[in-house]
Amino acid sequence: MAELVPFAVPIESDKTLLVWELSSGPTAEALHHSLFTAFSQFGLLYSVRVFPNAAVAHPGFYAVIKFYSARAAHRAQKACDRKQLFQKSPVKVRLGTRHKAVQHQALALNSSKCQELANYYFGFNGCSKRIIKLQELSDLEERENEDSMVPLPKQSLKFFCALEVVLPSCDCRSPGIGLVEEPMDKVEEGPLSFLMKRKTAQKLAIQKALSDAFQKLLIVVLESGKIAVEYRPSEDIVGVRCEEELHGLIQVPCSPWKQYGQEEEGYLSDFSLEEEEFRLPELD
């Protein structure tokens, strides 16, 4: 079986590990570092979150660890369950289970997380971005308002960015667009604040376009260990397929730039699920 790894926040239970019986001696920050070091050897981690035990339980901590890959989470669970790892007493590790059937819309990773995931699978020089267009739309709207003689007490900075992510090893290019609008008042905030907000809005537009481009890609991890990429501009695909169905993906180039002017939905930020959605398994 081949595993598909999307550029999305991992919310599946089989990508989430619950770790408990953590000692009360170290601080939460120290435990976070130790857990990250111990579990990152099995695969790239999306997040490590450490929480104190409930007041009715004995002193100590538990943790919620999210992997991008379900295979990596399974390997980590088998290797670390009932092992001492970094403390004198063994910890218990289980795959996550939910209180109830909760369905979440897949959330897009932010641009930095997308680049981190791409670097992990394709190498630090395995992908790059090419900005096709970066345009400020604020002046256009301002001229339209001047022509109509409609006074505006406040203005907004608006930037549009179109770019493409390039994966040379897979002969793949994926387009993305981003639009950012930042309300402001040039008179109240002053010229320095205006310049800073303008620079920030420009940067956010690039980041949103970069994230949008990555959302159209799926990382394909074959059983042989080879890595491929699949380009799907308008479909949400999460799961595992048989390797025969994915045969040839490594040599199949992605589609060129399409639908450049198509309006995209708003950018989804990088969120984490609340820990209350999971429960600790029954102790053996």
From Swiss-Prot:
GO molecular function: DNA binding; RNA binding
Induction context: Heat-shock stress up-regulated mRNA expression of isoform 10 and isoform 11. Heat-shock stress down-regulated short N-terminal mRNA expression of isoform 2, isoform 4, isoform 6 and isoform 9.
Protein name as it appears in the record: RAD52 motif-containing protein 1
Domain notes from UniProt: C-terminal half (amino acids 134-284) contains cytoplasmic retention domains as well as determinants involved in its stress-induced nucleolar accumulation.
Region (Necessary for nuclear localization and for nucleolar accumulation in response to heat shock): 1-92
Keywords for the protein's UniProt record, in alphabetical order: Cytoplasm, DNA-binding, Nucleus, RNA-binding
Keyword field contains Cytoplasm: yes
Oligomer and partners: Homodimer.
InterPro entries cross-referenced by the UniProt entry: Nucleotide-bd_a/b_plait_sf (IPR012677), RBD_domain_sf (IPR035979), RDM1 (IPR040224), RDM1_RRM (IPR034200), RRM_dom (IPR000504)
Necessary for nuclear and nucleolar localization: annotated segments: 90-133
Summary of the function given for this chain in its UniProt record: May confer resistance to the antitumor agent cisplatin. Binds to DNA and RNA.
Residue ranges of every copy of the RRM domain listed in the record: 15-98
Iron-sulfur recorded as keyword: no
GO cellular component terms, semicolon-separated: Cajal body; cytosol; nucleolus; PML body
Tissue-specific expression: Expressed in testis.
Annotated localization: Nucleus; Cytoplasm; Nucleus, Nucleolus
Cystine pairings recorded for this chain: none
